[in-house]
């Protein structure tokens, strides 16, 4: 059985100014396990599995930022995942931002001495992508704002929520057993979405875009925000296809991939399947403003799935979709709900 993944959003109406960052250079993911986790029979497995999932990011990203994530079992941001969900995420966003600001911040990050070749090279294509999407305002995840140094990077405020479906069979560590889902993989998918790997394209007429949407192409030099068109992730203006985005007619996040490679960012996860955190995943975070260690360790950690509570169309036969919930103006807004 495959499961679809997706993301949710919490939004802030205003954006804070530039904040000074302490000297230490290390990403910290701070999980806050709520009572749904601490009261579960699987509390130790959930907590250990989540920390294992987070370690691949904290061990390979050097930005000085602390990302605070509320972790729930059976719920996400207070909403039940029901009986069919694997995982879900919801991120806080700074909203109503002009594309020119996103371009400026990403370009500044790319000019940093700490920027990778991928990040530095990608910035030259941002102006054209922003121009192509000039009709839209942008939303910036608070976690990404921390990585870019735009707000206090060690703020204790929540950056997002992640929840895991409690009715699915999981393998919490080691080789994934037949008929079970890889918990670490699900967690990694969700964590990366809170960090910023999300799309604002939730319908044919999106209300906003995200920085990640600036790296979406249908052909060399042709940016897109289409919900249905076959599109791909590229950091060189569309010349090179690094991964194909999900455009399944039965749903799935448009910021996820279509499953052509065994990637943690895939929109669907099958029971018994082990996907991996690949180099392309670090490239995504790199161009979004994070700094990955050169040759970041892409150890064979199972792909993680992201599921958010929202309206989800009936998935393909034998598949479970992971979907996203939207939180607008600090109000939980259902975008898609996953069917089981």
Where in this protein do the model-derived segments appear?
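Extracellular zinc-dependent metalloprotease catalytic-domain scaffold
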Residues: 26-188, 193-310
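Bacterial N-terminal signal peptides that target proteins for export
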Residues: 1-10
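A short, hydrophobic C-terminal helix/tail in secreted or cell-surface proteins
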Residues: 316-333
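Short, charged juxtamembrane terminal tails flanking transmembrane helices
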Residues: 337-340
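Active-site micro-motifs of SAM-dependent methyltransferase domains
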Residues: 16, 193, 329-332
């Amino acid at each position: 059985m495959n499961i679809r993944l997706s993301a949710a959003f919490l939004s802030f109406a205003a954006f804070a100014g530039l904040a000074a960052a302490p000297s230490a250079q290390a990403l910290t993911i701070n999980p806050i396990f709520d009572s749904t986790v601490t009261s579960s029979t699987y509390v130790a497995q959930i907590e250990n599995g989540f920390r294992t999932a987070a370690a691949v990011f904290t061990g390979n990203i050097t930005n000085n930022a602390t990302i605070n994530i509320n972790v729930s079992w059976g719920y996400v941001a207070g909403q039940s995942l029901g009986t069919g969900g694997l995982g879900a995420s919801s991120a806080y966003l700074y909203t109503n931002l002009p594309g020119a600001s996103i371009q400026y911040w990403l370009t500044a990050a790319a000019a940093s001495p700490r920027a990778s070749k991928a990040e530095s090279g990608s910035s030259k294509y941002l102006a054209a992508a922003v121009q192509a999407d000039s009709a839209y305002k942008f939303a910036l995840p608070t976690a990404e704002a921390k990585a870019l140094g735009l707000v206090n990077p060690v703020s204790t405020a929540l950056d997002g929520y992640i929840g895991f479906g409690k009715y699915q069979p999981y393998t919490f560590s080691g080789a994934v057993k037949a008929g079970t889902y890889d918990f670490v993989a699900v967690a990694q998918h969700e964590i990366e979405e809170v960090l910023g790997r999300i799309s604002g394209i939730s319908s044919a007429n999106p209300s906003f875009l995200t920085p990640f949407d600036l790296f979406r192409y249908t052909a060399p030099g042709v940016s897109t925000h289409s919900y249905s068109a076959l599109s791909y992730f590229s950091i060189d203006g569309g010349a090179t296809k690094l991964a194909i985005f999900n455009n399944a007619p039965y749903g799935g996040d448009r910021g996820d991939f279509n499953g052509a490679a065994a990637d943690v960012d895939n929109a669907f996860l099958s029971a018994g399947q082990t996907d991996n955190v690949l180099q392309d995943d670090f490239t995504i975070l790199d161009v979004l403003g994070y700094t990955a260690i050169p040759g970041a360790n892409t150890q064979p950690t199972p792909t993680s799935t992201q599921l958010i509570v929202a309206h989800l169309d009936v998935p393909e036969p034998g598949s479970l979709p992971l979907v996203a919930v939207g939180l607008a103006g600090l109000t939980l807004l259902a975008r898609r709900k996953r069917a089981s």
